[in-house]
Amino acid sequence: MPELIPMQGQPRRELQREHHHGYKLEEVVADLVDNSIDAKADNVWIIFAEETYTNRIDGNYVPKESFFLIAIDDGEGINVDGINKVMNFGAERTYDELDLGKFGVGMKSSSLSQAREVTLISKVKNGQVNLRRLSSEVVMEQDRWTLLPELRPHMKTRAIDIAMARLSERDSGSAIVLEDMHKLKYRVGNESNRDAYLQSEYGHIKDYLSLVFENYIR
């Protein structure tokens, strides 16, 4: 089992609160794009699709259909110490005068409002790929905030494979992978056509990003 990196806080209660925040998906994606701009990225790619995600519940592995979202950039990347700081719930983000920084929710809180599993994968120039995962599965099991520096076998999903492959093609960059997107899974049950639902959500994201980042989008 991978080593666990402990963090501070009151885990289960805080985690449930994070999952129930009312942030819209397009606002969450905008916050991720904002981070990429801060990292001097020239390009940001958003991948939004469906996968079979496996949850570990009471020692049993339970597959279910769910959505994932990946934001990948070609920015400067983050070293392993930086990843630990970014993913720690005690960390705070600061902005200089040129930063957009207008969303005010932070990467961790905004991501957890949409997904139960959040993975940050990053690569600095001439460096190796590092990752940290903030897993609701692990937090609920152990009732403590922890970061996984390696993935459990069932966590090596299609979404992770895509992110790792895209980063391996670049000198540097970062990817945020949101999986087990609980709010979308709940809402999709009322839709007769999943593809239409997916395209509708993607359209909301695209329109919102075009409005917020009009000076950055080509």
Where are these regions (language model features)?
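Acidic ATP/Mg2+-coordinating residue in the GHKL
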Residues: 73
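A short glycine-centered beta->alpha linker in the GHKL/HATPase_c
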Residues: 77-79
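GHKL-type ATPase core
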Residues: 96-218
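Hydrophobic/aromatic residues in the conserved F-box-adjacent beta-strands of the Bergerat ATP-binding
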Residues: 69-70, 176
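Bergerat-fold ATP-binding/catalytic subdomain of histidine kinases
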Residues: 85-100
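Exposed loop/turn and edge beta-strand positions of beta-sandwich/beta-sheet ligand-binding modules
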Residues: 65
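Residues that line or immediately flank small-molecule/substrate-binding pockets and catalytic motifs
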Residues: 48, 90, 122
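Bergerat-fold GHKL ATPase/HATPase_c domain
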Residues: 1-58, 62, 81-84
